[in-house]
């Protein structure tokens, strides 16, 4: 096993992903499970691997991810940001392409809290004028 490793941390909603890239054949593990088995959806898998595809590093790195919190969609977003940040440690040349694709921006959208007197964050009972 190689000593060279690149780390990246990604967060999305309430998910947090610690990503480690090592030179290898393209193995992708999430929480010690094969990524396809963990995410269970090709759409989420494609979303998580987007930075690798954009930087054209498909079969060059083994990816190990430890992700916690949230649902699968939030976890896939956190993994995507973590991989993008780890790729920046590999080479700064990837920055331009990743930045224009929006891979380096932390998605700050989170669920709005429920307010007292309302049914949900903004949903209120029907208003009657008369």
Curated annotation (Swiss-Prot):
<dbReference type="GO" id="GO:0003723">
    <property type="term" value="F:RNA binding"/>
</dbReference>
<dbReference type="GO" id="GO:0006412">
    <property type="term" value="P:translation"/>
</dbReference>
<keyword id="KW-0689">Ribosomal protein</keyword>
<keyword id="KW-0687">Ribonucleoprotein</keyword>
<dbReference type="Pfam" id="PF00380">
    <property type="entry name" value="Ribosomal_S9"/>
</dbReference>
<dbReference type="GO" id="GO:0003735">
    <property type="term" value="F:structural constituent of ribosome"/>
</dbReference>
<protein>
    <recommendedName>
        <fullName>Small ribosomal subunit protein uS9</fullName>
    </recommendedName>
</protein>
<feature type="region of interest" description="Disordered">
    <location>
        <begin position="109"/>
        <end position="130"/>
    </location>
</feature>
<feature type="compositionally biased region" description="Basic residues">
    <location>
        <begin position="111"/>
        <end position="130"/>
    </location>
</feature>
<dbReference type="InterPro" id="IPR000754">
    <property type="entry name" value="Ribosomal_uS9"/>
</dbReference>
<dbReference type="GO" id="GO:0022627">
    <property type="term" value="C:cytosolic small ribosomal subunit"/>
</dbReference>
<dbReference type="InterPro" id="IPR014721">
    <property type="entry name" value="Ribsml_uS5_D2-typ_fold_subgr"/>
</dbReference>
<dbReference type="InterPro" id="IPR023035">
    <property type="entry name" value="Ribosomal_uS9_bac/plastid"/>
</dbReference>
<comment type="similarity">
    <text>Belongs to the universal ribosomal protein uS9 family.</text>
</comment>
<dbReference type="InterPro" id="IPR020574">
    <property type="entry name" value="Ribosomal_uS9_CS"/>
</dbReference>
<dbReference type="InterPro" id="IPR020568">
    <property type="entry name" value="Ribosomal_Su5_D2-typ_SF"/>
</dbReference>
């Amino acid at each position: 096993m190689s000593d060279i490793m690149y780390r990246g941390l990604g967060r999305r909603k309430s998910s947090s992903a610690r990503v480690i890239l090592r030179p290898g054949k393209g193995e992708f593990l999430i929480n010690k499970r094969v990524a396809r088995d963990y995410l269970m959806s090709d759409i989420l898998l494609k979303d998580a691997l987007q930075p690798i595809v954009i930087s054209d590093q498909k079969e060059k790195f083994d990816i190990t991810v430890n992700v916690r919190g949230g649902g699968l969609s939030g976890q896939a977003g956190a993994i995507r940001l973590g991989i993008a940040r780890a790729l920046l440690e590999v080479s700064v040349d990837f920055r331009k392409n990743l930045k224009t694709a929006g891979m380096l921006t932390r998605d700050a959208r989170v669920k709005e809290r429920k307010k007292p007197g309302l049914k949900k964050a903004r949903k209120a009972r029907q208003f009657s004028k008369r």
